[in-house]
Amino acid sequence: MQIREVFDRKRFVFLDGGMGTQLQARGLQPGQKPELAALEMPEVLTAIHTDYANAGADILLANTFGANAKKLTGCGHTVEEVVSASIACARKAADTTGACVALDIGPLGELLVPAGTLAFEDAYKEFAQVIRAGAAAGADLVFLETMTDLYELKAAILAARENCDLPVFTSMSFESRGRTFTGCTVESYAVTAAGLGADAVGINCSLGPKEILPFAQRLCRSVPAGVPVFVKPNAGLPNPDGSYNLNPDEFAAEMKEYAAIGVSMVGGCCGTTPAFIARLHETFSPLTPADKIPIRRSCLCTPVRFVEVNGITVVGERINPTGKKRLQQALRDGDSAYPCTQAVAQAEAGAQVLDVNAGLPGIDEAATLEQLVKDLQAVTDLPLQLDSSNPEALSRALRIYNGKPIVNSVNGEPETLEKILPLCKKYGAAVVGLALDKGGIPPTADGRFAIAQRIVAAANAAGIPNEDIYIDCLTLTASAQQEGAVQTLEALSRCKHELGVRTVLGVSNISFGLPCRGYLNTTFLTMAMSAGLDLAIMNPNTPEMMAAVRAYRVLTSQDLQSTDYVAAYADVQIQTTQTSKSAATVAEVGAAAPGGDALFEAVRRGLKAEARAAADAALTMREPLDVVNVSLIPALDAVGDGFEKGTVFLPQLLQAATAAQAAFEAIKAKIAASGQAQGSKGKIVIATVKGDVHDIGKNIVRVILENYGYDVLDLGRDVDPERVVEAVRQTGAKLVGLSALMTTTVPNMQATIEALHAAHLDCKVMVGGAVLTPDYARDIGADYYCKDAKASADLAKQLLG
């Protein structure tokens, strides 16, 4: 098959199946690195590829899933050697049938900043090395799979796009709740990957065909029509013995439903064998892929928050230094705490997007905007509007943004369009076009509409579709140009209905220089919404403005069943009073006000600097133990409960833990200064078992346990059973946590548990990892199975207090 045939959708394209279980079944020993199979057992590896090719696979994934520098450290071989040998084995098999060879790339095994410690550009470099090696070795395409972190996937896509000219396939793994391990939604994945230039997108691993089907349907609706969708499910769900519950016939029968939803490529993942692919080939070969009918929608996103701009959407305006001395000083000082608190406050007030501007004379705008984006991504899950016309600042901010942002802005000048539109296209961003040019802002609606037409045409020519174009017809102050308000609204309405794009306005500009600005702002906002305004850049902390937005959504059926309106105002009492000027004002009483515990709120929000300051303040009035038990632990519990319920996601959980750690440092310092002994709730030993180099889950467990007051000895990854036994013996730990991600290393987990039992140590063992289930954990001798870090903390509290 020629690589171009993969995309023509004339027939189904067949991917291969599982590799790890095949290697294990054909002689790979526990602890042996699967990535080295091409060097240590090339005949076996080639035979596996050949079996898949003979079963009908059109694309063979080379055995390079973990062939990166981090995972190959200490193995005695370079990335280039391993990748080249692996591609050669796959190519030898592919040549017998004409199949294509994919450079298979999996996750690096570490969380990226801010959730972890791996920098975005460091992840990029790791992927780039593998991709260059794969391209040099003759791979036909790059296949990024089993990703759970959208930020890591972005680094990998950029590495592929910038270091080779091969097609790029991307695939993420979703849990049963419809989100990845880090909380990414199907829609956020779809629009981000497609926006970055992925040639095909898909879903693999974690679940079986039946469970993945609804997520694949959402994926097909969310990617552009020209981007193929593929699926590679597991062979059903895992059994207690590590096998899977579907045979080839059952697998193919469940997979057949995908033929009708727009998927055009099918294959298998864990537990599938050449027999599964052969049966899949037999089932799908007579069929033709159904047309994929995506929904063309305007949207912005972060991994966990997908904002569809289908009606009035609020953009918080407070992170803009214009006229804000406190923010100006914070930007000059490099103080991230203040803009972060502004971000959190706007989110809680109802903003759905945050405008971020670092344009201040005397500072490095590019460096400041880049750092602001990093800092804000750590504390809020709202999409960002990158407010700059500086190409360097936008390039740096767009590169490290996690998701799909919007750029504010371009104007009608060709030079600006030529510099900024390609950046928006490269990074998959939406763009705001200002209806002005070198002649300034036209006084009439016709003049502004003409500029908008030029902007839309230029954006379309750059490959940016109408749904990603937002036109700002510009709000002029009523005090200076009173007739301008009507012209703005007329131009806005024409852009919305004649050009088929979205609209945006900075609403508050209308009232500059006039008294009682809130009256004008609210009235103009209502008029603009009626004219077709989509993005309202405004202060969400103004109750009257948010009330107008929420009421408008109810009256235009955007807020179905008035759900959001009722949630906001069910407990609000309206009081009408007379001011000194005899003007009636409305005060909202009983709205959700922040509680009196500043430390609790800072930890809950994940604000590190505020948590430290609140702890310092609390310690001047309260005993350290009281601060821990009344503020810190309840805050962590609240965030943990949200995580269990699916309302809080991994990044927020880790940010709360980081904020709590900052508070704990203040508490430790207070205890040390008082000369009091610092007690521990108990000692826990944790490790990733021998042969496994994945430690994301283990590291998260460590952070959470430490913040609950336990002494945690982290032995790292690829840990021998003897080291675990010795650590427990030396520390007297009563609880041991073992982690494994790969099926090939679960036997080493069992060996470690057996070694602990043989040593007659008085400890309990909890285990976790993607390949484990409660039944499987029991079968290998573990005392407890913990599905996540919160479960580990709950167990520690149960056993150790």
Predicted regions and their residues:
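Domain-level signal for soluble alpha/beta catalytic cores
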Residues: 1-801
